[in-house]
Amino acid sequence: MICVGIDVAKDKHDCFILSSEGEILADVFTIQNNAEGFDTLLQTIRRYTRPEVKIKVGLEATGHYSYNILGFLLDKGLPTYVINPLHTNLYRKSLSLRKTKTDRVDARTIAAMLMSDVDLKSYTDTAYHNEELKSLTRYRFDKVRERAKLKQSVSRLVTILFPELEKLVPSLHLASVYALLSEFPSAKQVAGAHLTHLKAVLSDASKGRYGRDMAATLRDAARRSVGSIMPAKSLELKHTIRLIRELDAEIEDIETAIQAIMDEMQSPITTIPGMGVRMGAVILAEIGDFSRFDSPDKILAYAGMSPSTYQSGQLSLSGAYSHMEKRGSRYLRYALYNATKYVCHWDPTFAAYLAKKRAEGKHYNVALSHAAKKLIRLIYAMEKSQQSYRNAA
């Protein structure tokens, strides 16, 4: 067996090749982070291998810097291990008391870790899907948050330009309202619109739900409006609505990509009543490989949902007086709480559990956190057994 250690950087990678007998086959050499460099690495590896020789390639998880070299290695069919830098650091310290930290040392350390057969798992298709899913779900999270801020801006601008509008429609954030405000971004412009044209705009955007009566109601309200006449704010409103529409389209594209990966993964998580694809995808993406966790409690700690304990001298606060740690993955914590709300609504077992906790006098959010813990234990069991909800429950 040969072990290849790669220390990844932005522009270049340091590599080291070691045999299972401890022989240095290729002392630390540097390749550029480009096609020529990747080919050099591949040819060097092949120089020391035969069909019967097992290969292990290891590199540190360095975020986006490792994506391209990792993809290349996987495409060439080389078993690749992505190692947490913390583990590399601890392993290096266990080998030497000297505080040496260079790329050359790291390349050797990674190869030595592979040779020592410490508990490492090779990068798999599942890991690839999880990484893709994490990128997509976090990207969607950011886009949705960006859209929410823009919607707040719309509400603020409507309060200035046409404050009566909000009481005449179920929500300002309807396609019909956006269509109206895109063409008539102030009460004055709505008041001066031809009724037939106003009706056509509303009818087309609402798919016939709003017609002449709504158009007349809005125009009458606009003519009595106390809204300000501020062309700059009207322009800002039009541009803000356009940005929201663009974000709507982008989010839809992201959700399509998420759905495609979820279809390929075929996780049983979406068989839980109330567990949608979007929240299920975030949970799977943030947890990643379930085999990394010995128990559901480890996942709860990773999500920052374990109760914290304060201890000073003889004083120890825990149990009823403890608070959630709120460390770990905020994305996972967000998804678990939101998914739990829906699961408690749609599933009788979880609904009864939430009601039981509320009957014990617990605040709604505290009761919900208990239900979230119950949910993560269920998900853990389902992912381990690959059974659907009804079989796992």
Q: Which residues make up each language-model segment?
A:
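A detector of single, family-specific signature residues
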Residues: M1-A393
